[in-house]
Design a protein with these regions (language model features):
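Formylglycine-dependent sulfatase
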Residues: 2, 8, 12-14, 18-390, ...
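Long, internal low-complexity/basic segments
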Residues: 23-30, 37, 42, 67, ...
């Protein structure tokens, strides 16, 4: 494919200087275009080393622009990631981390409004997905499927900030429940049997098919990029438009989206500065190995527009008038939940080493997000492990409880399979990473440890400040809970007696961790009493704990029959966790009739339905085949998706 004039590089410094001076004299400001796509890891593009895919437009853009080699999304799920993009802050600071649930937040935290006040015309076509009840469209001049930088409402010389998001690579493209009727990807130059699979996924036909289908989507994204580059050229905008091209988080190969591994966090990100505006990036070009994350993009856009980023923004401007001179030493990421499974996890990296902290470590990573488990590869992986056919310990890791702390050497172990946290020679690195994360959750006032049902009816960000909430005490408890020892019992005993629900919950997590690890074997009466706690999250977590303390009948009965029907899914979350433990399955079997009734009679067509969760538990118990998880209704839907192909939209109107 020929290179478009947009990418022509000047060979003369004099021309570069004259263009810079001309821009300064006219007091011009650049247009800024974000072209975003979904669910795609960095390794899925040719310019990031993938030889199985054809991405000429992105490869060309990377060669002529700035290719970020260590760019992280803040979160491995869409809404939490986009909440960070739009605010320039970690989404946990505003309690916007739970996917995909909007909560009340301060109303003035979306940065495009500042651009509008500075004279920019701001458009979004059209996905928002910010986890805020504030009108997501309020910060844009236009926010719909017709919004365009070509709008007749934009002034003749008015600079624009335009965002286009395509869903062509979204997981929904391969969330087809089965592979029957799938297109022949070899017609697109993608050969499933020749693909190089990541070592953390099993080599199964469904895994290869899903990966091939997603690489087809990546090629479509590349074509979509080319359409915009041509439009900018045709309209004479290429010389005045800075482009950012990136994914919202990692991709659709299993153990990617939703997980704080590199496969879920490291995104392809390319920035292109036309010669006229290259001085704003200090002439930078080529591969950038520094650490970058989504909190940096909002401040960067403001800085490029000549607007000083507000002090409350936690990211750093990479380029422009207010570019930060500080080098980022470490960067952070977060995950809050897998659908109904509340399981906060945090991560930090210095580029070489990666630390993942699971605050409820007995919650397996394989707990199902029932949307993601519509991918045939996830179903096939479940069948391999749960059916007892797996012989590779690496492929079983996500099905088991994991250490509260994990440490990986990304240089030697890019697939993050070999945990170094227990190896003495890495003790100093482990300590440094642990301390960096501990400091981070405190300096950012991380609200992600508050229960989902405690975030409604108020603006949590303001409530904790107004009431001088004991956040430091909470963080200390949270850190102890996942690594509790018998020496922690006095703190845990105090916590479960607290009038504050969040303290009771994390106290229970500490007891559950001790019980799961066989560090205690008798059930305290105060813990047993929490089966009747008015907060269903506390009652369900207590029920999980007492099952391991000789009270299986009482605990499982509480999980099977909630105090209120609306809380059933919370109990099923803990029950699913138990059902992945082979030693606990016989304790659940006396309740099979109740589970089968729920699986048959409760709603099961939507990802959040309790009937679907009941079916998942039955699968774990060996009482249902994984292929029947979503029911017969899903088969026809899958056929239609396998025959079809997502459109490359939106386009520059």
């Amino acid at each position: 494919m020929r290179h478009l004039p947009l990418f022509m590089c000047t060979a003369f410094c004099g021309l570069y200087s004259s263009q810079t001076e001309a821009a300064d004299k006219k007091n011009e400001r650049p247009n800024i275009l974000w072209l975003t796509f979904e669910d795609t890891s960095a390794y899925e593009f040719g310019c990031y080393g993938n030889g199985d895919v054809h991405t000429p437009n992105a490869d060309s853009l990377a060669a002529r622009g700035i290719q970020f080699m260590n760019a992280w999304s803040v979160a491995p799920q869409s809404s939490a990631a986009r909440s960070s993009l739009i605010t320039g802050c970690y989404s946990s600071t505003y309690g916007m981390d739970i996917h995909p649930v909007p909560y009340d937040t301060p109303a003035d935290i979306f940065f495009p409004q500042r651009l509008r006040e500075a004279g920019y015309y701001c458009t979004n076509n059209s996905k928002t997905h910010y986890n805020s009840t504030t009108d997501n469209k309020s910060c844009w001049d236009e926010c719909n499927n017709k919004a365009s930088y070509n709008s007749t409402k934009r002034g003749k010389d008015q600079p624009f900030f335009a965002v286009y998001n395509t869903v062509t690579s979204h997981m929904g493209r391969i969330r087809t429940f089965h592979t029957d009727g799938r297109r022949d990807y070899t017609q697109e130059g993608i050969f499933p049997q020749q693909l190089t699979l990541p070592s953390y996924v099993p080599d199964l036909p469904e895994v290869r098919s899903d990966y091939a289908g997603h690489l087809e989507a990546v090629q479509d994204v590349d074509t979509w990029l080319g359409i915009f580059l041509k439009d900018l050229e045709t309209r004479g905008l290429e010389d005045n438009t800075i482009i950012f091209f990136f994914s919202d988080h990692g991709g659709c190969v299993a153990r990617g989206k939703g997980y704080l591994y590199e496969s879920g966090l490291k995104v392809p990100m390319i920035a292109y500065f036309p010669p006229k505006w290259r001085h704003l990036a200090n002439g930078a070009k080529g591969k950038e190995n520094g650490l970058v994350n989504f909190t940096d993009l909002g401040p960067t856009v403001l800085s490029l527009a000549g607007v000083k980023p507000p002090k409350n923004m936690q990211g750093k401007a990479l380029y422009g008038k207010f570019a930060s001179k500080e080098k980022r030493e470490v960067q952070f990421a977060l995950a809050a939940n897998q659908l109904h499974h509340f399981m906060p996890v945090r991560a930090v990296t210095d580029g070489r080493f990666k630390y993942i902290r699971s605050y409820i470590p007995y919650r397996q990573f394989a707990l199902r997000n029932y949307y993601q488990w519509g991918m045939p590869s996830n179903k096939a992986w479940d069948k391999l492990v749960l059916g007892g056919h797996n012989t590779n310990p690496d492929w079983k890791q996500t099905f088991e409880p994991h250490p509260a702390e994990m440490l990986f050497d990304l240089e030697k172990d890019p697939d993050e399979l070999h945990d170094l946290s227990a190896i003495p020679e890495y003790a100093e690195t482990l300590y440094k990473m642990r301390q960096a994360l501990s400091d981070h959750i405190r300096t950012t006032h991380d609200l992600g440890f508050f229960l989902p049902n405690s975030r409604t009816g108020h603006i949590l960000y303001e409530k904790v400040r107004k009431e001088k909430y004991p956040l430091d005490e909470l963080y200390g408890l949270v850190e102890i809970a996942g690594t509790a020892t018998v020496a922690s019992l006095p703190m845990l005993e105090k916590a479960i007696a607290s009038p504050l629900p969040v303290m009771r919950f994390w106290g229970v997590v500490g007891y559950a961790n001790l019980a799961r690890e066989n560090q205690i074997n008798t059930c305290p009466q105060a813990l047993l009493a929490l089966l009747q706690d008015e907060n269903p999250y506390i009652a369900s977590e207590a029920a999980y704990a007492v099952v391991y303390l000789g009270k299986a009948q009482e605990g499982i009965a509480r999980l099977i029959t909630p105090a209120q029907e609306k809380d059933r899914k919370i109990g099923y979350s803990s029950l699913e966790c138990l059902s992945l433990d082979p030693e606990m399955r016989d304790y659940i079997r006396p309740f099979l009739s109740e589970l089968k009734e729920a699986a048959e009679n409760l709603p099961r067509l939507e990802n959040e339905d309790a009937g679907l969760m009941a079916r998942g538990i039955l699968v774990n118990l060996g009482e249902m085949d994984i292929k029947d998880l979503h029911g017969p209704e899903a088969y026809k839907k899958g056929l239609k998706l396998n025959y079809g192909r997502r459109a490359m939209v939106p386009l520059p109107n």
